[in-house]
Amino acid sequence: PVTKPMFWERMVACLLTTQQRSGPNTAVSRFLRTQPLPLGYEACARQDDLGEVVGKVLANFGGLRRTTTIARELSANLTYLENGGWYPVLSHLHEIILHPDPETERRAADFIDEKLKGFGPKQSRNLLQGLGLSRYETPIDSRITKWLNEFGFPVKLTANALGDHNYYAFVSEGFQRLCEACGIMPCVLDAAIFSSFDGDQWTEENAVW
């Protein structure tokens, strides 16, 4: 089962990787490999002013962007979770474990997108992927659209429109249908495309998840 600390740390990772480089040798990856994680759940839950603490921790680490925004988002998300949000969030994730299918994953991703600050269609699926719960609903970004265009997707795709929920759903559905026709799970093809862009830079030592 997904625990609160596990969910929280993956959520922190998702917010940190938004709009900034997160390859194996970046500041984001170095921060997330820090043990224990400076912004772990137990440490954050006992803060009276989480936003201020997060801002200082991220700024002092250095090399990280959007520190003020991330601080505000984490503070808002903790408030939501601690005031009744944990139950529906964890229930959606538990439902995926019980019924692993595209619809269940999509409902969970949409719920996260709706309820948590800093999350859109891509990062909500990033969170599911980080928790090991995403088989069908994968994070789609410019790498995926570039690969699909080169592969011969029937419609010319642009990553700039992926923030629109309907457009994202359209691309995701096409990606899943392609995978079904090829007899491969979407999460596997996603990983293959991802690694083809980063080469062999990721190792067991520098992996974040």
Model regions and ranges:
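Extended cationic-aromatic binding surfaces that line active-site or macromolecule-binding grooves
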Residues: 2-38, 154, 169
